[in-house]
């Protein structure tokens, strides 16, 4: 097996969304008064020392249905590309990933995508050092994070990982990385202009866990 680093699991793809689509989402988010100050953690608390952004979960909203559908089809395609690239980077086989919760469901397991959040950062806002791992009571543990960068006409706002990896926001770029505690990262301070991203997670739903929440 080759020598594998944490950085091998941090993978991005360029131009996954069109310029027109990205611009439309940014403009729509800018004008949507339902956005709210972002919350953090399983307890969904407000902590501006950690996270300072405006968030909107678009998937339940009827007037965002078209955008939600485009995010869904794009995610479905590039999640598979992520797994293919990950195998190339690590030399590991699909059989390995089938037993570790990274994208290949087996034995009744389900990997749930729970929808998309649009985030807007104004100058002076950021998301400080954190990791994305939580265990949701119904959805299970998060296993994979994805981010779309919707614009790049701002300054600052890079995604930085604790190992020194830095991702420069570029319109249409999509980033994947594991949601575990080992992938501590931050969205750096935006210093000029507004930054827009869309983000979400895959959750690993074990069949035993799912059965606990079935209607009796």
List the model feature ranges, each with a label.
Residues 1-174, 182-216:
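Fe(II)/2-oxoglutarate oxygenase catalytic core
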């Amino acid at each position: 097996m080759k020598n594998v680093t944490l950085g091998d699991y941090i993978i991005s793809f360029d131009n996954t969304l069109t310029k027109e689509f990205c611009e439309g989402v940014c403009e729509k988010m800018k004008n949507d008064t339902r956005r709210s100050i972002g919350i953090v953690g399983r307890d969904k608390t407000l902590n501006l020392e950690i996270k300072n952004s405006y968030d909107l979960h678009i998937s339940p909203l009827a007037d965002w249905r078209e955008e939600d559908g485009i995010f869904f089809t794009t995610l479905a395609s590039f999640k598979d590309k992520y797994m293919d690239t990950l195998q190339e980077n690590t030399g590991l086989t699909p059989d390995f990933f089938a037993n570790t919760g990274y994208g290949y469901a087996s034995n009744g397991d389900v990997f749930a995508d729970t929808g998309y959040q649009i985030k807007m950062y104004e100058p002076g806002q950021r998301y400080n050092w954190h990791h994305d791992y939580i265990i949701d009571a119904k959805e299970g543990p998060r296993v994979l994070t994805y981010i779309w960068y919707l614009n790049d006409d701002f300054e600052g706002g890079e995604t930085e990982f604790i190992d020194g990896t830095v991702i420069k926001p570029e319109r249409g770029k999509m980033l994947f990385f594991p949601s575990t505690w080992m992938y501590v990262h931050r969205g750096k301070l935006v210093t000029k202009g507004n930054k827009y991203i869309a983000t979400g997670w895959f959750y690993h739903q074990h069949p035993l866990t799912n059965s606990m929440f079935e209607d009796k």
